[in-house]
Amino acid sequence: ADNNYRFTRELCEWCLRNDVRFIYASSGATYGDGSLGYSDDDAVTPTLAPLNMYGYSKHMFDLWALRQQVLNDIVGLKFFNVYGPREDHKGDMRSVVNKAYGQIQHEGVVKLFKSYHPDYKDGEQVRDFVYVKDAVNACLWFAENRRVSGLFNIGTGTCRTWVDLARAVFAAMGRPPNIEFIDMPEHLRGKY
């Protein structure tokens, strides 16, 4: 939480004092379960309820920036589910695409968590998956367009199911889909 709140705040304050463009990574995780929608309007920000410490720490900085009235001078980017090359160093925090690729390569099967939410069948849980190069292009656009400031969502704007994503990885690897549903660990339930 220190990295995502205190250190980000200190860096932001330094940038503001020294007239340096400040663009920071917030997260789609700040939206919690999505029941309040995904509007990046400032008026919605105080009402959000993240589900985990990561989302909460990102949300705390968004709230600080809003309350300090500095969102007119900085840019916050709420990245959704970014995937792409060179993720192995992220361990358990790698994208589902990266995990699926490894599972298919080594085991020939993708293991997805069963749904514990009554509105979603197993594998029908949805996320907005955005390719890392598209996320980088968004960052570069904001770096080049200094007149633009505020809090912005960075995603495709379209949700896909876990099953759709797994099938796409199988197709990209030229293999038939083989998906197994496993129980979600208790400590993760209600957190994602």
List PLM regions with ranges.
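Structural signature of the Rossmann-like NAD(P)-dependent dehydrogenase/reductase core
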Residues: F22-S26, V75-N81, D128, N153-I154
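Conserved sequence/active-site signature of Rossmann-fold short-chain dehydrogenase/reductase
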Residues: T30-Y31, V82-G84, A135
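Active-site Tyr-X1-5-Lys
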Residues: D33, A49-F80, K99-H106
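Short-chain dehydrogenase/reductase
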Residues: D2, P50-H59, K90-N98, D128-F129, ...
